[in-house]
Amino acid sequence: MSLTTEGEALCQHADGLLDRFAALETELADRQNALNGTVRIAATFGFGRRWLGPALAAFQAQHPALQVELQLTEQLPDLGIQGYDGAIWLWSVQNRHASDWVTRRIARNQRVLAASPAYLQRRGLPADLPALATHDCLVARENGGAQPRPFDLWTLRHARDGSTARIRVQGALASNSGEMVRDWCLDGRGIMLRSLWDIAPQLASGELVRVLPHYAMPEADIHWVAPWRPRTPRRVRLLIDFLVEAFRTEPWKLEAPARPKPRRAKA
């Protein structure tokens, strides 16, 4: 069974009318001074719990008539079908050119190598990437997609010359929980690759130490991600502006603490 040419034209016209009605509904709602309605957002567990949750609570306190719903998940949901306004997600360079997505960067996401002083005293500080490959590394298998990903293959960029290298790491411990990997690292079980927003307090206190500090993972920054719509509600636009301003100074980014001097590992 298939539509006639006239039927296809009618369906396309109907789709256009629905978009216009949705835009008109949003425009009428925006004329209200006070924000109301519901904003529904998805985010990853780590950033959602540690940083996004408090920011959303602060925004809602400024707009008491507004409802905010935060869904924490490790898989990016189908935002349009499941009724989300958008998601706060790590969005890599490869994703940014997708025409059916609307994105805005919320914060920079720098991922660095770190270990505990106890581990470095026991195993030594790796002098270069080949030496890193001989160490116990803690692998986080987070945010997996439909396609399998080699989580033990780390891509690292040199801060000075911008060169990148891929290194396959080894280690006996891996988890789909970033918090678990961080706990293992604090317990002296190996070297991990984590976001600064996740471990800045431990770096500042000296519980963790940067390893190979001139290297970091190429950035997949934290973005507002949403499917394209004819018009974005005012409550959503103001929330995005609020989050950009809240994280503009990267509140987790602290001055690097004085580093202990563990012995260097032999190459």
Enumerate the predicted regions with their spans.
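Basic, amphipathic "hinge/linker" alpha-helix immediately C-terminal to the N-terminal HTH DNA-binding motif
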Residues: M1-R20
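Hydrophobic residues within well-ordered alpha-helices
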Residues: T4-G7, L79, L132, D183-G188, ...
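C-terminal effector-binding regulatory domain of bacterial HTH transcription factors
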Residues: Q12, A61, A65, W197-P201, ...
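Central regulatory/effector-binding core of bacterial HTH transcription factors
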Residues: N36-S99, P257-A267
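Short, well-ordered beta-strand segments
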Residues: R40-A42, A87, L138, M192, ...
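Acidic, Gly/Pro-rich loop/turn segments at junctions of secondary structure
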Residues: Q71-S175
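Short secondary-structure boundary segments
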Residues: W91, P117, L196-W197, Y215
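Hydrophobic hinge/microswitch elements
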Residues: S163-R210, A216-P218, W224, I240
